[in-house]
Regions:
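Short, acidic/turn-prone active-site loops that include or flank metal/cofactor-
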Residues: 6-8, 116-118, 141-146
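A structural preference for short, hydrophobic beta-strand core positions in alpha/beta folds
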Residues: 3, 78, 168-170
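C-terminal helical cap/extension that packs against the catalytic core
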Residues: 15-20, 84-86, 127-186
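A generic short alpha-helical patch detector that favors 3-5-residue windows
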Residues: 13, 36-39, 147
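Extended acidic/charged loop-beta regions that coordinate divalent cations
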Residues: 1-27
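Nucleotide phosphate-binding/pyrophosphate-handling subdomain across enzymes
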Residues: 24-136
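Hydrophobic anchor at the start of a short beta-strand
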Residues: 1, 111, 165-167, 188
Length: 188
């Protein structure tokens, strides 16, 4: 078992939601935003090195290419920089806390949030974990979730306990359009 030492991970500065990583001499711009991804990248690096020590042909360039190429669609995924749009499929308090931490560390302000939830998830805790992240939250009913989808009005009622401005929308597309019209600096 190889466990990376957290003190050996040296975060680097970059643009908002960029994740520069320095571990064991491997300096890479990770495609996975969020400092919570750096220990994961260190584990991946150690795993590749362990395989190399066992005779696998893995060179330093391959490790760096892997670190740069790793993706998790819809997990703090920047899909546009102008306008600034991030997609995150967090569906529980822990995922929401990771998103909130990443947004706060990036010092992103003036953001709008678009959110839909499943009725069987811990919606109130998830909303509380995102407190302070959005100047305005637009709620939607997830279109493909079937009977598990929490109605946009119900989500808005819960969200009003946490967010200063909440608007009910019919679809995510409507919410994104409205957020852009309202002039927010970015949308998550």
């Amino acid at each position: 078992l190889v466990e990376p030492d957290a003190d050996d991970i040296l975060p680097q500065k970059g643009r908002p939601l960029e994740n520069r990583f320095d571990y064991g001499g491997y300096l890479a711009d990770l495609a996975l935003p969020g400092s919570h991804q750096q220990p994961n990248a260190a584990v991946a690096t150690e795993a590749a090195l362990a395989l190399w020590r066992r005779g696998w042909e893995i060179d330093d360039d391959a490790i760096l290419r892997g670190l740069r190429a790793a993706r998790m669609p819809a997990r703090i995924e920047v899909v546009s920089r102008d306008p600034f749009v991030v997609i995150d499929g967090c569906h529980n308090p822990d995922g929401a806390a990771a998103l909130a931490s990443t947004l706060k560390k990036a010092k992103l302000t003036g953001l709008a949030g678009v959110m839909g939830m499943m009725e069987d998830k811990n919606c109130e805790e998830t909303l509380r974990a995102l407190a302070g992240c959005f100047a305005h939250l637009y709620t939607v009913t997830p279109q493909t979730a079937g009977p598990r989808a929490l109605d946009t009005e119900q989500l808005a009622e819960l969200a009003r306990k946490v967010f200063p401005r909440v608007t009910v929308c019919d679809t995510a597309a409507d919410a994104l359009e409205l957020a852009a019209e309202d002039g927010y600096e970015g949308t998550v």
